[in-house]
Amino acid sequence: MRYAAAEKLEIIRLVEQSSISVRRTLAQLGIPRSTFYCWYDRYRSHDPEGLEDRTPAPRRVWNKLPAAVTQAVLGLALKEPELSPRELAVSFVDQQRYFVSEASVYRLLKAHDLITSPAFILLKAADHFAQPTTAPNQLWQTDFTYLRVIGWGWFYLSTVLDDFSRYILAWKLCTTMTATDVSDTLAMALRNSGLERVRVRHRPRLLSDNGPSYVSAQLGSWLVQHGMTHTRGKPYHPMTQGKIERYHRSMKNQILLENYYLPGQLEQRLAEFVDYYNSRRYHESLNNLPPADVYFGRAQTILTRRQKIKLKTIELRRRLHHQTAASTSTQMGQILS
């Protein structure tokens, strides 16, 4: 069977990302090892262009999406128009247990004129601290941002975010920006994380900017009492806290679509967004997982399940392609006989 260059590249990516051995992965895909390593050597030497064949590519694509899957993807896109092609692809795999790639979803949506420009342009923030975290609760980022309630004025949202997983541990809508507001939010984070109830060798390190509430002696004393160390970002360089800065922009892109006339209305909308962000929003930097799955240690189980779905789907499409090709060949033989 002849494969197009794009199909070869997809198989190479699949083998590279597989959680099982190369031999077992290729066996499940029905690809001889000698064939795969020939492709791989050409790919490493000449990039994707090296996978092109000199002879014309086959007319029939073996892993084309079935019509029923195409309609299901379009239905999900119409049901949840706020999702990007990447988020739609991951959501479809998790919900339907059938693999579709981001590229396939993008081409499908584009063909049906369902690709739209974002309502807001997000400025890029630095995503990595100088000393990257390797597990939850090693480093917490915290910051304030402003939100307005009509007839009441400005309120200040204090948030604590886990650096490793981006999980929102705690938030508080405040009328001031004092050290007490900060320590109250941190106390909620300690309770929500469970660290308040257990003895741990190292408490999370806190990362903040140099605002008055963060450099105060009152907060410093509170942190010492609770066994936490404190790192402050470089002055006039807010991108040190890239993850919480990005969270604030994502949150405001949704929250500011509505007007609020009572603080309680704003708090309710914030609670809804935090729940969505933590539990249902796929993050590309987290291998397309929501923060809660990473924070609570479910990541590897989900990624392994997705990999199995991908292998099973590709094998199913390959079998269907062979069946279709065999049926077509039989029909042609009957016509010519």
Task: Annotate each PLM feature.
Residues 203-210, 224-243, 257-263:
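RNase H-like polynucleotidyl transferase catalytic core
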Residues 41-139, 237-238, 295-302:
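Basic, flexible linker segments flanking DNA-binding modules
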Residues 19-21, 83, 100, 261:
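Residue-level signal for the short linker/turn that defines the boundary of a DNA-recognition helix
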Residues 68-69, 98-99, 107-161, 167, ...:
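Mobile-element integrase/transposase regions
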Residues 2, 224-228, 249-337:
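C-terminal domain-tail junction helix/linker
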Residues 1-79, 228-229:
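Residue-centric detector for conserved, function-critical "anchor" positions
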Residues 186, 197-216, 234-236, 287-292:
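Acidic/histidine-rich, metal-coordinating catalytic segments
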Residues 171-172:
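Short hydrophobic alpha-helix segments
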